[in-house]
């Protein structure tokens, strides 16, 4: 039942100047059609790019900005960080920090 135009219009009618949405939280799940991972909204039964729809609605309606909170942390990615004492399901060693940085930069383009 997600309706980007309705969200944007409601925000504008309430006098808001911007909308902020979490594009990717620490769990690594992406609310857009990511080319870098299948851990995204397009791999769910919903199969719609939420961020794209919100961006289009903001442009069409006008007068309201769209902002993103994008977590650099990504617990889902195997190269994010080596395991800390409370994380039993992550490797103790062997993560590739540079590979994770490259992955993150590609997502931000």
Give a label for each model feature:
Residues 1-109:
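Mature catalytic domains of secreted/periplasmic carbohydrate-active enzymes
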């Amino acid at each position: 039942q997600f309706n980007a135009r309705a969200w944007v219009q409601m925000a504008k009618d309430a006098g808001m100047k911007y909308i902020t949405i979490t594009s990717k939280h620490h769990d690594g799940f992406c609310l857009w059609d990511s080319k870098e991972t299948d851990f995204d909204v397009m791999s769910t039964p919903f199969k719609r790019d939420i961020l794209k729809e919100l961006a289009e609605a903001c442009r069409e309606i006008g007068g309201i900005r769209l902002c993103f909170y994008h977590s650099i942390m990504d617990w889902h990615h195997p190269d994010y960080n080596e395991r800390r004492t409370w994380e039993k399901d992550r490797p103790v060693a062997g993560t590739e920090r540079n590979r994770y940085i490259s992955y993150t930069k590609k997502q931000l383009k």
